[in-house]
Amino acid sequence: MANLRQTPLTCSGHTRPVVHLAFSDITESGYYLISACKDGKPMLRQGDTGDWIGTFEGHKGAVWGVALNPQATRAASGAADFNAKVWDAIKGEEIHSFQHKHIVKSVNFSTDSNYLCTGSNEKLVRIYDLNKPDAAPQVFSGHKNGIRHVTFFNNNIALITCGDDKTLRVWDRNSGQEVKRLDFPAIPNSMEVSKDGNIITTTHSNIVTFWNSRELTKLCEYTAPTQMNSASLHPDCSIFVCGGEDLKMYKFDYATGTEIESFKGHFGPVHCVRFSPDGELYASGSEDGTLRLWQTTVGKTYGLWRCIEQTPAIQENTAVLNNKQEVPAN
């Protein structure tokens, strides 16, 4: 298995760079993947195959952030048209549109799907009650520059944000007050909270760092070969993957930081990386306008990947064919 070649599935359809992606939880019908693109058209796909399901049309500018609720019945998007939108992910119809005063960079649902949080270039975080969409949102202020990422945390009683002011902040939802903070030497390009909520993964420059989410203490930190724009930790915390400016996807051992393997498939820098909820694959989005799905265990039968176990005879014949010299045609 270790010597098999990684063959990613390429998901086309977007016409501009893919800048963000997100998976749903595992549902009765599988799990789903949504992508954000500068073409302004978020796309929904079957998560394990990459098959296109539909496109959410309505934004009038680049889409920077997307999210699916756990059940994959609702989608959200934030865009350069100063709007955050909530969609019926089954019908593809717009349900809500929340006007902002600047570009919306990040959106996320609460785990109960009743609330939407947004982060924007206004330097503000907002929480909207989706059962009372006309009500004024709860607003959190404190960042000195635009907000790149925001997510609910700790059973929805807290929020985590990171922004262009080189900080990561934890907020108490009830009081709206900042309760913890991290300062970075450079702008954090990505932020991910592990499925169990215990680990925060961040990237800045060529550094991938893992933090204890409760105390914001550093668990481990690794230096990558190039600037890393995004990283994702496997659900079982055994490995992590990351991608960045050199077009490659990297896989590392979480405990030691040892590079396990790297693959080149994209034709532009990698902007976003995420593991599927079952950990069997990871998805990447790139400047080249495509998403690619990569197997965590190369050669395993899963989704559209089919593995044929080779008998010794087949392996011997394959070796003969591989060593056979080609004869030029007359």
Model-inferred region functions:
Residues 259-262, 267-269, 277-280, 287-330:
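Terminal intrinsically disordered, low-complexity extensions flanking WD-repeat/beta-propeller proteins
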Residues 7-11, 51-56, 93-97, 134-140, ...:
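A short beta-strand motif characteristic of beta-propeller blades
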Residues 36-39, 77-81, 118-122, 161-165, ...:
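Conserved strand-to-loop turn within each blade of WD40 beta-propeller repeats
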Residues 11-18, 57-63, 98-104, 140-147, ...:
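WD40/WD-repeat beta-propeller blade N-cap
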